[in-house]
Regions:
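N-terminal nucleotide-binding beta1-loop-alpha1 segment
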Residues: 1-30, 36, 41, 45-54, ...
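Conserved beta-loop-beta/alpha segment of the NTase-like Rossmann-fold superfamily
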Residues: 76, 85-202
Length: 302
């Protein structure tokens, strides 16, 4: 029986990202370098991690602008150095398709915390891939946060660990990970996804478990209903294990959380903005897949 190729699905959560910066646009569109946005840096990070597909979770209000900026696919940077020596480099590049999905209306206002955007993105990657073929089912998922800034090239050294089936992977900075609420990338498995869903379902609904004398359930006060929509990253992802038996945990040399003005200002004042400089138009140029039967006219070699 032929072996199935591994499928690492990249998840970039934009929906329900709290806006602490106060800019007149979505926080994911914040520049991290001249002409280089946070969401583009997140896509490039997912590409360095070795993702085969990238799923951007964003609602209809911001999706058109993000899609216009990011496009429908990017290239795997690990293959770029190899392809430049080929006679036709564009034919040797590895393409990574980018998909866009919004939250379901039944989840909005009930469990739509920022962490749930990650869960929803992973579930959509499973549902859509399985609809195509069971051979396309994702093995693992890698989360790339747009508001967590660090050197994406570091991921290239740990591709095998990130893609290893059945084991989680996480980045750590000064002893903290996503389990502490930091926007540090991590990879998780199907079993981890089940645990995340259970944690979200621990949130309250509209009614309490208390039954009244007339047999009806008691309604909770409005401030206590649907508590899952307020769950933080550390609460939802506290059960993921990063140890040598069940996962990997690796340290990074620098990291900035730019979801607030203080963190964003510190990042701009550091020398790290230059390390995270624009990777080149070859990765960020807007591209669309051609329709069936239409020749590929994108022959750019920039």
């Amino acid at each position: 029986m032929p072996s199935r190729k591994k499928h690492l699905a990249g998840i970039i959560p934009l929906a329900n990202l709290e806006d602490k910066l106060g800019f007149p646009y979505h926080p994911s569109l914040t520049p991290v370098y001249g002409g280089y946005l946070a969401v583009e840096a997140a896509v490039h990070e997912a590409a360095w991690a070795g993702c085969n597909t990238i799923w951007i979770v964003c609602n209809d209000d911001v999706q058109p602008l993000v899609r216009h900026r990011v496009g429908e696919y990017t290239y795997d940077p690990a293959f770029m150095d190899r392809s430049k020596w080929d006679r036709f480099p564009s034919q040797s590049r590895k393409t990574i398709p980018i998909y866009y999905t919004g939250l379901l209306s039944k989840d909005i206002g009930k469990r739509d915390c920022y962490a749930y955007s990650i869960i929803h993105g992973a579930q959509m990657a499973i549902d859509v891939s399985r609809a195509v073929s069971h051979w396309a089912d994702p093995d693992k998922f890698y989360v790339s946060f747009p508001m967590g800034v660090y050197n994406p090239k570091a991921l290239g050294y740990y591709r095998k660990e990130i893609n290893k089936p059945g084991k989680a992977f996480g980045w750590r900075y000064e002893g903290k990970t996503v389990k502490d609420g930091e926007h540090l990338g991590f990879a998780f498995t199907h079993e981890n996804l089940k645990d995340f869903r259970k944690r979200i379902m621990e949130g309250t609904g509209t009614y309490s478990r208390e039954t009244l004398a007339n047999g009806f359930q008691k309604k909770l006060p409005s401030e206590e209903r649907n508590s899952g929509r307020h769950f933080s990253l550390d609460k939802v992802f506290q059960d993921v294990i990063f140890n040598e038996q069940e996962g990997f945990l690796r340290d990074i040399s620098w990291y900035h959380k730019i979801d607030n003005w203080t963190g964003y200002r510190d990042y701009l004042a550091s020398e790290h903005w230059y390390i995270l400089r624009h990777p080149g138009k070859i990765y960020t140029k807007y591209r669309e897949f051609n329709q069936i039967g239409v020749d590929d006219i994108d022959n750019s070699e920039e």
